[in-house]
Structures are given as structure tokens and as C-alpha cells.
């Protein structure tokens, strides 16, 4: 048993070492599938930029005042200036201020919670009272204790 575990650990270690090494062998697809595959031999020289950087660049000087509350960027595919709004602003030109609103908790909510908890406790106490009362009635002995008086 211990020998099997030792062999399994050694095989796992060798597999991990081969997978992590840069000299791992790449096996090409079978000859039947090779005609449909194309290989890129310059994978190490190719660096792909993020997609977001390909589409927009900073605006020209004539568009600098286009965005009211944000940074201007020029989208090459749309061929127009777009705005990246600062926090709290929205709109095509960042012209709308998003107001943060705060709701004040009303006392009605707390009153409703208090009434609900009170009803729940009352129901629990009523069930407990009924259970204790039924138990006390069942504890009474069904036999009558006679004290040596008259015979039956």
C-alpha cells in the first residue's frame, strides 16, 4: 500500500515538473486535422493589448471642452468624442449630477416590528399555558382514595 502511494506521488511530481517546465513538448494534432489548423510560430513575440485600449485615445485639443465633468476620449470606430465621467456624474457629456439620497427610518417600521414581536411572544405563552394546563389535568389520579368509611 505504501509503495503504491510512493509511486503515485513520484508520478504526480514528474507530471507537474514537466507541465511547469518551459521545455515541455508540444504534440501537434493528427495528420487528418493538420490541414484545418494554422500555427503561429511567433507566439513569444506577440503581445495582445487590452480591447479597451484599441478603441479610444485622448481627445484632440478642439474637443477638450466637450466633457463638462469628465475626461474626453476619442473613439476611433464611432469616430466621435466620448466622455468618461467623474464619480457622481452621468450623461453623454457628464452633465447630470447624481444626487445621493438618504432615507430616514420612520417610527412606523419600529412600531410594526414591536407589535409583531409582542404577538409572537403572546402566542408562545398561550401555547405554553395550554400545554401546562393539559399536563396538570392528566396528572390527577383516576382512582378514588377511600378512607375506611362505608364499603362499596
Swiss-Prot record:
It is found in: Membrane. GO terms for biological process: angiogenesis; cell surface receptor signaling pathway; epidermal growth factor receptor signaling pathway; MAPK cascade; positive regulation of epithelial cell proliferation; positive regulation of MAPK cascade; positive regulation of mitotic nuclear division. The chain crosses the membrane at residues 110-130. Expressed at low levels in testis, heart and liver. GO terms for molecular function: epidermal growth factor receptor binding; growth factor activity; receptor ligand activity; transmembrane receptor protein tyrosine kinase activator activity. The keyword Cytoplasm does not apply. Keywords: Disulfide bond, EGF-like domain, Glycoprotein, Growth factor, Membrane, Signal, Transmembrane, Transmembrane helix. Residues 131-152 are cytoplasmic. SUPFAM superfamilies: EGF/Laminin. The keyword Cell inner membrane does not apply. It is a single-pass type I membrane protein. Disulfide bonds join 59-72, 67-83, 85-94. Glycans are attached at residues 36, 40. Residues 19-109 are extracellular. Promotes the growth of epithelial cells. May stimulate the phosphorylation of EGFR and mitogen-activated protein kinases. This is Epigen.
Amino acid at each position: 500500500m505504501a509503495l503504491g502511494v510512493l509511486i503515485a506521488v513520484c508520478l504526480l511530481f514528474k507530471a507537474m515538473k514537466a507541465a511547469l517546465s518551459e521545455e515541455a513538448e508540444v504534440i501537434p494534432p493528427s495528420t487528418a486535422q493538420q490541414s484545418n489548423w494554422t500555427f503561429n510560430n511567433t507566439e513569444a513575440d506577440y503581445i495582445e493589448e487590452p480591447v479597451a485600449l484599441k478603441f479610444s485615445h485622448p481627445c484632440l485639443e478642439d474637443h477638450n471642452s466637450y466633457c463638462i465633468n469628465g475626461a474626453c476620449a476619442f473613439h476611433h470606430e464611432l469616430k466621435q468624442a466620448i466622455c468618461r465621467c467623474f464619480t457622481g456624474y452621468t450623461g453623454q457629456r457628464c452633465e447630470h449630477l447624481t444626487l445621493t439620497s438618504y432615507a430616514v427610518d420612520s417610527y412606523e417600521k419600529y412600531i410594526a416590528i414591536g407589535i409583531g414581536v409582542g404577538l409572537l411572544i403572546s402566542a408562545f405563552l398561550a401555547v405554553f399555558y395550554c400545554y401546562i394546563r393539559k399536563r396538570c389535568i392528566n396528572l390527577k389520579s383516576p382512582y378514588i382514595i377511600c378512607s375506611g368509611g362505608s364499603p362499596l
